């Protein structure tokens, strides 16, 4: 175990990416099965999840585990994926 070097930066980025993927999946399931994107419950879940991820990114940035630009890129990528998912959902209805 002493010989195993842990790269906390890579681990932090990977965990944040997993959380972003989880948010995308959660919203996809909600759009497919539960509510419309205009529904207040949908918007509340999305806002809460995005806020939580932004706080995680802020925390990791403050610890020096990720660069601020990397955090911004992660949020931007997730926002684009969610926007595409929203457009796809609206075109099906």
UniProtKB/Swiss-Prot annotation:
Coiled coil segments of this chain: none
What Gene3D superfamilies does the record tag this protein with?
A: SO2669-like (1.10.287.750)
| Family under the similarity heading | Belongs to the UPF0358 family.
Q: What is this protein called?
A: UPF0358 protein LMHCC_1561
Species assigned in the record: Listeria monocytogenes serotype 4a (strain HCC23)
